[in-house]
Amino acid sequence: MKRAQTYALVFALTLTSTAATAIAGKRVEIPVSISSRFAQGALADARASADNNQYIGCYTTEYSGTCVAIDAATEASAACTTQDPEQLALIRSITTESAIVFSWNRDGTCRTVTVWTSSFLKPAATSGY
């Protein structure tokens, strides 16, 4: 639990430190980044990035889920899997305007999954590709 709180604090500090001045409310950009067993990023920012590398997302089946990230700067990749019902519910709540933070255990199972949906995140493009 303490580690989950630490990851949430790191994510919140990232949001605060990357905040840009905006005319109509606070806005932040959260590019995909990966560190030791921890990944984060906003779906809309990854999709709108100038590079063709960064990616973050999660998917589920009836009984399991997987989160995957590719860091634009280093092209490192990360993934974790889960069968935890609470984590699956969080993964299923992801929208195109969400930010995802996940961490994993040494065996590749998801330790934590956090989903943020907020007005300060970039809205998803409405025009598609």
Model-found features: residue ranges?
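Bacterial N-terminal signal peptides that target proteins for export
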Residues: M1-A8
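N-terminal secretory signal peptides
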Residues: A22-T66, I70
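Beta-strand/loop nucleic-acid-binding surfaces
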Residues: A76-A89
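Short peripheral tails and domain-boundary helices/loops at the edges of structured domains
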Residues: W116-Y129
